[in-house]
Swiss-Prot record:
Gene3D superfamilies cross-referenced by the UniProt entry: 1.20.1280.50
Protein name in the entry: Putative F-box protein At2g03610
Pfam families registered for this protein in UniProt: Beta-prop_KIB1-4 (PF03478), F-box (PF00646)
Lineage: Eukaryota, Viridiplantae, Streptophyta, Embryophyta, Tracheophyta
SUPFAM superfamilies with a match to the protein in the record: F-box domain
Highest rank taxon of the organism: Eukaryota
PANTHER family in the record: GENOME ASSEMBLY, CHROMOSOME: A05 (PTHR44259:SF98), OS07G0183000 PROTEIN-RELATED (PTHR44259)
Domain F-box: 19-69
Originating species: Arabidopsis thaliana (Mouse-ear cress)
């Protein structure tokens, strides 16, 4: 049975809890708390309030070295706490977000010495580049089709017109608009790094649709 003293203590405890303002914590107290957080929670903490953001910028974990200018990359993808960046020099950088702070993978990056380039013909330029991560973490025996902002993955051998596995298929809108090409559908062969133009279809880009039975 609660005594009058117990009720008084409970009221004081509730009053103290209601009066707590976590946004007004002393910076010297808040700073070590923020620095002890994981990488994800650490970056979430800066959105709590303006006071926390001010303290967050003074923490040791605040490091902008891994930040990438959006103008220096073609595309990015995120999977299993790792950020993959396809850079302007055709390399893939990998940043690991599983630790206390993002770290760039060096020796463990299998693509560090493997630039992804293609042989350009005169006046040929591919201006939309994408990076895709397969479920297995590698891209083998697969075909990627880009169009309408959708990427499809299918384990097929050959569907005709030069479209086969180990290739990337793209359509007219993925090319530099002024490029005079014999076809509006291109095939990029991953093994040879060459682009072929099977044939020109007499339709517009918004009329072309891809359909793969069993994968749609």
């Amino acid at each position: 049975m609660e005594t009058p003293n117990d009720l008084v203590k409970e009221e004081k405890r509730q009053g103290a809890s209601e009066n707590q303002d976590w946004s007004k914590l002393c910076p010297d107290l808040l700073r070590p708390i923020l620095e002890s957080l994981s990488s994800i929670d650490f970056h979430r903490a800066k959105t709590v309030c303006s006071d926390w953001y001010s303290v967050w910028k003074t923490c040791k974990g605040y490091d902008s070295k891994w930040n990438q200018n959006s103008g220096s990359i073609f595309d990015m993808a995120y999977k299993n706490s790792k950020l993959y960046l396809y850079t302007l020099d055709h390399h893939i950088k990998i940043y690991d977000f599983s630790g206390d702070s993002p770290k760039e993978e060096g020796l463990t990056n299998p693509y560090s010495n493997h630039p992804f380039r293609f042989d350009e013909k005169p006046q040929e330029y591919i201006w939309k580049r994408k990076i895709v991560i397969a479920e297995s973490g590698e891209m083998m025996n697969e075909m990627l089709i880009f169009g309408h902002g959708v990427t499809m993955r299918a384990q097929v051998h050959d569907v005709g017109d030069g479209i086969k596995r180990d290739s990337i298929c793209f359509v007219e809108d993925d090319l530099w608009p002024d490029f005079d090409r014999p076809s509006n559908c291109g095939i990029f062969n991953l093994a040879t790094s060459r682009i072929t133009w099977p044939k020109r279809y007499g339709v517009y880009i918004d009329q072309k649709q891809w359909f793969l039975p069993g994968f749609a």
